[in-house]
């Protein structure tokens, strides 16, 4: 057949020796397309002999591989699935043998699991269907027998619903089983102990010629190491007794067990010798001597002054007559406690000496500050004060009568001047209290202005207050330990004010411009002080006028 219809084709030629002269045979031998189709449709006959195989001398012989053969692969797969199916069938057969259709058994009434319990549970069945007398009698007897057995004999732990306090027989039965099990276990535990006891002592197998050899053997091989109880180490366990309790005599003491780290180790106790004790005490004494003989450096301001001698009581040791400590090899606990007490007393005495030195230094500092303040008070005078020939303060410490005389003399001296507002800077702050009546502190305005007397001494414009000026590090800053309490130190630090020298030389630069050193602060407090002085002067004037008998105009309030 041609591959395409457009290509020309011709029928094949007749074979050699074929004669086509006969027209009839020619017409018969002429084949058509129909004949060719039939030829194709007819199956090929099986060959009687195998066709000659082609000679493949030029190709290499190839081994047969079963994996590449599709037929072999199909056979393998079929056999594999056949095995799986066979295994499933066998498993189903096993399950079918074990399986019980309990629902079918209950329907047929042949369920063996519930034969015993059905007799007890089906009480209502006797009333539903009227049984025969014989069946009723046998069923009732059987049921009564089961009840009696369960009551007196007790069931077993698996099939009995236990009720606390009711199953007496079962309880006794279980107790007996437990006791028998415990007895068996004890016997099993005792058996190996008895067997070990029966073992022969190895010492009997050895023959000793001398007693010394036997003793050496026993010391080497039979010496048992003593078992130490860890709770009974030195200092490990102690008894705590509450002595304040009323029933301390009869009460059981509490046991206190300390940690191993808190207890002294046995090695440290055994290795400590007398030489170690002596060395430790010597180092301690030398450290005390080093601390006690330390000389204190004198400050710059104290260099010119003579050193104040310490009173002999300060250096007196309370253990002066005891003598030097000589350690002994064996010390009783009481001696150790006494020694510790002495050491504590020495430490306390040393601390007291140091505290006395500090207190003495602080007292000197305070005294110097007081002297400096007195000198500054002498230099200072009020703006309103009249000039005096003698600036020395009057001595008012002559007794209670001298203060009254002083007030009287001042009143007589300044009786004529109604607007006198000055005050005198006195030596001690107690004098201000004594002169309180003169300045009107006893009148009704005193409680409104409690700080009047302290603020009346206004600095003069002519002189500069150098107390706040930074004097450099001549005196040295006062530290925390120069004060007794933290509150005093905090108050000192809060009130501390120091301006540089440049502020007194060139003035302080403020927001409104540079102010000179004659700068005087005008605030509300100063204004109130001035008004109070005027009011107090008017009140004093009226009092004097009333005392003289002059009629004074009284306010209407």
Swiss-Prot record:
One of the Pfam families matching this protein, by short name: RED_C
Compositionally skewed regions (Basic residues) per UniProt: 294-303
Matches recorded under InterPro entries: Red-like, RED_C, RED_N
One GO process term, biological-process aspect: mitotic spindle assembly checkpoint signaling
Residues bearing PTM Phosphothreonine: 485
Alphabetical keyword list: Acetylation, Chromosome, Cytoplasm, Cytoskeleton, Isopeptide bond, mRNA processing, mRNA splicing, Nucleus, Phosphoprotein, Repeat, Spliceosome, Ubl conjugation
Covalent cross-link Glycyl lysine isopeptide (Lys-Gly) (interchain with G-Cter in SUMO2), where: 151, 310, 331, 386, 388, 404, 408, 496, 501, 509, 541, 543, 553
UniProt keyword Transmembrane, yes or no: no
GO CC field: chromosome; cytoplasm; nucleoplasm; nucleus; spindle pole; U2-type precatalytic spliceosome
Ranges where the record places region Disordered: 1-90, 181-205, 294-402
Chain positions with Phosphoserine modification: 287, 417, 460, 536
Oligomeric and partner information: Component of the spliceosome B complex. Interacts with SMU1. Interacts with MAD1L1. May interact with DHX15.
Protein's name according to its UniProt entry: Protein Red
Organism name: Mus musculus (Mouse)
Gene of this entry: Ik
């Amino acid at each position: 057949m041609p591959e395409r219809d457009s290509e020309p084709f011709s029928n094949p030629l007749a074979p050699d020796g074929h004669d086509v002269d006969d027209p009839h045979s020619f017409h018969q031998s002429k084949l058509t397309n129909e004949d060719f189709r039939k030829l194709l449709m007819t199956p090929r006959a099986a060959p009687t002999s195998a066709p000659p195989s082609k000679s493949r001398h030029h190709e290499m012989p190839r081994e047969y591989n079963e994996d590449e053969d599709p037929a072999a692969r199909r056979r393998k797969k079929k056999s594999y699935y056949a095995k799986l199916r066979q295994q499933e069938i066998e498993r189903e057969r096993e399950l079918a043998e074990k399986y019980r259709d309990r629902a079918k058994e209950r329907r047929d009434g042949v369920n063996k699991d519930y034969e015993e319990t059905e007799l007890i549970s089906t009480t209502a069945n006797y009333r539903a269907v009227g049984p025969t007398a014989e069946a009723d009698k046998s069923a009732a007897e059987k049921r009564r027998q089961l009840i009696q057995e369960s009551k007196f004999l007790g069931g077993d732990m698996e099939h009995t619903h236990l009720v606390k306090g009711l199953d007496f027989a079962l309880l006794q039965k279980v107790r007996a089983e437990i006791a028998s099990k415990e007895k068996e276990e004890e016997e099993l535990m005792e058996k190996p102990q008895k067997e070990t006891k029966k073992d022969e002592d190895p010492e009997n197998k050895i023959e000793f010629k001398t007693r010394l050899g036997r003793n050496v053997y026993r010391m080497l091989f039979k010496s048992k190491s003593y078992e130490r109880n860890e709770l009974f180490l030195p200092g490990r366990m102690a008894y705590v007794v509450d002595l304040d309790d009323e029933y301390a005599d009869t009460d059981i003491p509490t046991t206190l067990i300390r940690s191993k780290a808190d207890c002294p180790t046995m090695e440290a106790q055994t290795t400590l010798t007398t030489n170690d004790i002596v060395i430790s005490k010597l180092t301690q004494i030398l450290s005390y001597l080093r601390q006690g003989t330390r000389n204190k450096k004198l400050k710059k301001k104290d260099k010119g002054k003579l050193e104040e001698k310490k009173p002999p009581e300060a250096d007196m040791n309370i253990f002066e007559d005891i003598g030097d400590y000589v350690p002994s090899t064996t010390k009783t606990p009481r001696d150790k406690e006494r020694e510790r007490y002495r050491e504590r007393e020495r430490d306390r005495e040393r601390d007291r000496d140091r505290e006395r030195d500090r207190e003495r230094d602080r007292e000197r500092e305070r005294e110097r500050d007081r002297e400096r303040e007195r000198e500054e008070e002498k230099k200072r005078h009020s703006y309103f004060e009249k000039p005096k020939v003698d600036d020395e303060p009057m001595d008012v410490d002559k007794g209670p009568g001298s203060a009254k005389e002083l007030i009287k003399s001042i009143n007589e001296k300044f009786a004529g001047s109604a607007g006198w507002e000055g005050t005198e800077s006195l030596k001690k702050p107690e004098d201000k209290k004594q002169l309180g009546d003169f300045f009107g502190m006893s009148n009704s305005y005193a409680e409104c202005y409690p700080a009047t007397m302290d603020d009346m001494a206004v600095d003069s414009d002519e002189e500069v207050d150098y107390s706040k000026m930074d004097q450099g590090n001549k005196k040295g800053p006062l530290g925390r330990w120069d004060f007794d309490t933290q509150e005093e130190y905090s108050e000192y630090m809060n009130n501390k004010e120091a301006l540089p020298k440049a502020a007194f030389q060139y003035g302080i630069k403020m927001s409104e411009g540079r102010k000179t050193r004659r700068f005087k602060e005008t605030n509300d407090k100063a204004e109130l002080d001035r008004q109070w002085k005027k009011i107090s002067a008017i009140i004093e004037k009226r009092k004097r006028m009333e005392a003289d008998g002059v009629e004074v105009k009284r306010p209407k309030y």
